[in-house]
Amino acid sequence: MIDATELGDVAKICGVKYDIGMESRDDTHEDIAPEKKNNIVQDITYVAILKDYGKDVTIPEPEGYDPKEFACACASPVCITPKEPDRVWSKDMMITYGRLPNHKYMINWPIEGNDYYINLIEMTPEERLKALEYAKHYTMCFVY
């Protein structure tokens, strides 16, 4: 069975044996594979569209905001130990990546940004709702 649904949860719902996540480098012999197998199905990203109003308009600080979580989203003096040193790009690259017409910007940044890695397949519907709400909150923290 090949499950190509959004969440990849048809096999679980059907009671079919399944395996999820990325295989390890030892399993695949691929340099791009992670060193250890994981259960990441697909990152959840709540994309944000922002508008530049030309003046300081800052959203309220989200509860639990920790600037260290996003310190290496782009190259800066506070980025000391990036998770992926080869992928730390400039702030200009980040802004250009999501530039839209009419002074708007799409915020969809995979590099220590607003991608939220979670395995929704193994969760109950209630747990999924909480996790998805947290993913939205995570994007708000990144925007802040």
Regions found by a protein language model. Give the residues of each.
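Aromatic-residue-lined binding/catalytic grooves and analogous aromatic/hydrophobic interfacial grooves
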Residues: 1-144
